[in-house]
Amino acid sequence: MFGTATRPSATRALLLGSGELGKEVAIELQRFGIEVIAADRYPNAPAMQVAHKAHVLDMLDGNALRALVTLVKPDLIIPEIEAIATDTLAQLEQEGVKVVPNARATQLTMNREGIRRLAAEELGLPTSPYRFAQSKEEFIAAVEAIGLPCVVKPVMSSSGKGQSVLRDLAKLDESWTYAQEGGRAGRGKVIVEGFVPFEYEITLLTVRAVDGIHFCDPIGHRQEDGDYRESWQPQAMSTLALARSKEVAAKVVGALGGYGLFGVELFIRGDEVWFSEVSPRPHDTGMVTLISQDLSEFALHVRAILGLPIGTITQYGPSASAVVLRDGHSQDIRYQGIGAALALVSGAQLRLFGKPEIAGRRRLGVALARGQQCEEAVEKAKAVAARVEVIC
């Protein structure tokens, strides 16, 4: 049973993290009349602009997080970012507050150490070789053990921040410093991964719901500077590789438990599959589903966490997303050329996230398009994104 938003009967959802992905989740929640309370570390975040209420706090502060939960009395807490006081979430869950998919999944996936140890050491899934390092000395030893080239990442970061490929020992200090600066919680532990000779990466959106486990078609994507620039669906792959990918994804989400959508990241080479990472929430590369499917990743996540059946997911054919990424400094961003951008491609769509400021490089929107093939859809989406003029 759902109540009516803002009324005594309201079913309340507290979003912890209010970026562009949280914004789409908030919109989907409101389609079911759910009252949405959006929280983040800065005011006027994208999801706050469409929520019923908004709160600003440091979500790594357990006392502040507990105080907010006491104030808003949510029926469910929906973590949308990694930088959250997960120990407090676990305590709240033990006290009867519903965390989706569950507090353990949030704890394990908020840092790469927890999920890598689950996947490789408990589930026995194929992964790249890895070592963790807390100090500069441990980092040097880890690089020596793994060998070059290797991938260096903070154990806690998002959108590629702090990630680098280390190919030359002369760049060792630079790689360590970059990882320390890119961590969501500041300086801390890093993971050093052996370089997997993969042909491509996919995101396999996997939904665990009341009516079982469901898979979206695989999503391919291109990364640059550790962040996604374009994604497309479906990614072409062999029947065996897809079957193995689904097997890996099902094992991971089954071990994490709870209902929701999970973004499972995998490396593929021929028929071989390696597990990379998983997020227990919508994935940035999955924004392509806003145009590629009848139920976007956000709609699927909301259905699952509300205990509703998924049924059949219908895919519309080759589709793509391309980010609107700009550099600048402004607290009053303006956009022009929207009409010209949309006129370029019949059926194209555009989402501007409404981010309140820019300081350096920031993802401000996403263009969406379909085509006869994925390559065509990507070029269309890139053309639309490039035509948007950002005035800082």
UniProtKB/Swiss-Prot annotation:
- A GO CC annotation given for this chain: cytosol
> Quick one: which residues bind N(1)-(5-phospho-beta-D-ribosyl)glycinamide?
20-21, 80, 284, 355, 362-363
Q: What is its EC number?
A: 6.3.1.21
Question: Matching SUPFAM superfamilies, A to Z?
Answer: Glutathione synthetase ATP-binding domain-like, PreATP-grasp domain, Rudiment single hybrid motif
Q: Which reaction does it catalyse?
A: N(1)-(5-phospho-beta-D-ribosyl)glycinamide + formate + ATP = N(2)-formyl-N(1)-(5-phospho-beta-D-ribosyl)glycinamide + ADP + phosphate + H(+)
State the UniProt keywords alphabetically: ATP-binding, Ligase, Magnesium, Metal-binding, Nucleotide-binding, Purine biosynthesis
Domain ATP-grasp stretches? 117-306
Source domain of life: Bacteria
- InterPro entries, sorted: ATP-grasp, ATP-grasp_carboxylate-amine, ATP_grasp_subdomain_1, PreATP-grasp_dom_sf, PurT, PurT/PurK_preATP-grasp, PurT_C, Rudment_hybrid_motif
Annotated ATP binding lies at 112, 153, 158-163, 193-196, 201
Q: Name one GO biological process term.
A: 'de novo' IMP biosynthetic process
The UniProt record gives the binding positions of Mg(2+) as 265, 277
Family per similarity comment:
Belongs to the PurK/PurT family.
What protein is this chain from?
Answer: Formate-dependent phosphoribosylglycinamide formyltransferase
Species source reads Aeromonas salmonicida (strain A449)
What lineage, starting at the top, does this entry show?
Bacteria, Pseudomonadati, Pseudomonadota, Gammaproteobacteria, Aeromonadales
